[in-house]
Every structure is written in C-alpha cells, then in structure tokens.
UniProtKB/Swiss-Prot annotation:
It comes from the Bacteria. GO terms for molecular function: spermidine synthase activity. Gene3D superfamilies: Spermidine synthase, tetramerisation domain (2.30.140.10), Vaccinia Virus protein VP39 (3.40.50.150). It catalyses: S-adenosyl 3-(methylsulfanyl)propylamine + putrescine = S-methyl-5'-thioadenosine + spermidine + H(+). Catalyzes the irreversible transfer of a propylamine group from the amino donor S-adenosylmethioninamine (decarboxy-AdoMet) to putrescine (1,4-diaminobutane) to yield spermidine. The active site is at residue 158. The lineage of its organism: Bacteria, Pseudomonadati, Pseudomonadota, Gammaproteobacteria, Enterobacterales. Spermidine binds at residues 64, 88, 158-161. This is Polyamine aminopropyltransferase. Pathway: Amine and polyamine biosynthesis; spermidine biosynthesis; spermidine from putrescine: step 1/1. Residues 5-238 form the PABS domain. GO terms for cellular component: cytosol. Homodimer or homotetramer.
Length: 288
C-alpha cells in the first residue's frame, strides 16, 4: 500500500471507516492472516488484520484496561491468568500491573503477530514480555483450552471478530474448553463486537456460554477505533455475585492494587454492566 493514501476497513459491507496512511511500517501475509501496521496522524500506529482494525496507539488503553481490570478486580484474588490472543502485548501489559497475579499464560496462534508487534508497537507491550511471570504459547486457543492441564482464575479472550482465525474462538467447543480449565469461582471475558451493529454475535455468544456458566452477561466501553458505538464484552462465571459487587468494594480493591488508569475506575466498572434496553430485549428473546 502506498503512503498518503486511505486505508478502508472491510468489516461491514454497507458502511465503514477509513484511516489516512502516513507511513506503512509493515505489511505482510503471515501464515494465518494479512497483517498491516501503519502510522496515522490522529491515532498513531494502527494495526489491522484481514482488513479489520485491531488496535491503535491513541485509544488502546480503553479496551485493554476494561478487558483486564474488570475481571481481575471483580475476582479479587486471581493468581493465574490466561490470555487467548493478545499478540500485540497490551493485554499482557495490563495484567502484569496486578502484583498478586503469579502466572500469566498467553496463547497466540500467530507467532508473526507477536514478533512484528514487539518491533512496531513497543508501547503496547511496554516491556511486559520480559515479566518473569509470563509464558508465551504459540498454539490454537481452542486446542489449548481443551488439552492443557493448567487451570486459571481469569481467562481473557482477546479474539478478533468471528472471521478467519478468530472464528473458532466463538464456538461452543472453545467455551466448553474454557469452562474446563477455569477454577471454581473463575471469570471468563471476551470481546464481543459493537452490539448495535453486531447484535447477532452477542446473542449467539450468550446462548452458547449459558450452556456452561451459571451467570452470563455483558459489559461495555466506548472505544472510538471500533466503529459503530459501544464495544461489548462477554462475561461468564458461576458466581453471580461477582457481577453485582458494590462500587465501594471495587474501590477498596482498586486502592489496594495501586493501579493508575486512564479510563477504568470503580464507578466505570459498576456502570459498565448497565446494558441498553434493545440488547436486554434481544438477549431475553428465546432463540428460534
């Protein structure tokens, strides 16, 4: 792709967004997907896979803070964390900020994503790949959760949209495997798209997860990069009390953690579970 052109996202057929490309840093077809990293004056460095934006330097902190601190502070004493995907390293960066976490396992299907992001998106991982608690596994996430002998307190599925390599991370086989290796009282979270435009994905995830977990819901955050409104995150656990913790309890845990965040705070944490009525209605409608 030439510089000083416009890169158009291809996620939706009838509408979408574009980014001006100031400088292409890297573009290659890896073993699994088409990867491009380029610079944009408004959003900094941008990474896209198979024509869909995955992350930008400008607003990645919102996504990664909400995907990590919500489940970890709701759990309260997570020791072992599993990240599925997350090759850019930012999810790992946020998990390493929790000093009570003892082990962090990251399973990424595409070694190329890890390598190229370490080189071209260094601010995302911020040195977290060198954390002694961290273990990188290059493997398919579905295969890992169904075969590992390890168990985890929190599982974070930092998956792409349900197309290409990411499609398998929205299947019952994957969810069943996550339940299999999740400790009692554990929490599973996953990105689930922009619910206004991808409502069927939320409905499908809710239906499938409900077969394996006693409490299944969603929480939300506003992330400009993800076109179309509010980003939705799937939430699944067998302890329904964890979704209803008071702001005061979360505030106490947040204070003890010593975290300093740019988006996340205890009030945002509790408010994030308030879902718009159209999504509540859709989730309450029986599947045909």
């Amino acid at each position: 792709m030439a510089e000083n052109t416009k890169w158009h996202e291809t996620l939706h057929d009838q509408f979408g967004q574009y980014f001006a490309v100031d400088n292409v840093l890297y573009h290659e077809k890896t073993d699994h997907q088409d990867l491009i990293i380029f610079e944009n004056a408004a959003f900094g460095r941008v990474m896209a896979l198979d024509g869909v934006v995955q992350t930008t330097e400008r607003d990645e902190f919102i996504y990664h803070e909400m995907m990590t601190h919500v489940p970890l502070l709701a759990h309260g004493h997570a020791k072992h964390v599993l990240i599925i995907g997350g090759g850019d390293g930012a999810m790992l960066r946020e998990v390493t900020r929790h000093k009570n976490v003892e082990t962090i396992t990251m399973v990424e299907i595409d070694a190329g994503v890890v390598s190229f992001c370490r080189q071209y998106l260094p601010n995302h991982n911020a040195g977290s790949y060198d954390d002694p608690r961290f273990n990188l596994v290059i493997d398919d996430g579905v295969n890992f959760v169904n075969q590992t002998s390890q168990t985890f307190d929190v599982i974070i599925s930092d998956c792409t949209d349900p197309i290409g390599p990411g499609e398998s991370l929205f299947t019952s086989t994957f969810y069943e495997g996550c339940k299999r290796c999740l400790n009692p009282g554990g929490i599973f979270v996953a990105q689930n798209g922009v619910c206004f435009l991808q409502q069927d994905e939320a409905i499908d995830s809710h239906r499938k997860l409900s077969h394996y977990f006693g409490d299944v819901s969603f929480y939300q955050a506003a992330i400009p990069t993800y076109y179309g409104g509010i980003m939705t995150f799937a939430w699944a656990t067998d302890n329904d009390a964890l979704r209803h913790l008071s702001t005061e309890i979360i505030q106490a845990r947040f204070h003890t953690s010593g975290l300093k965040c740019r988006y996340y705070n205890p009030s945002v944490h509790t408010a994030a579970f308030a879902l718009p009525q159209y999504l509540q209605d859709a989730l309450a409608t029986p599947s045909s």
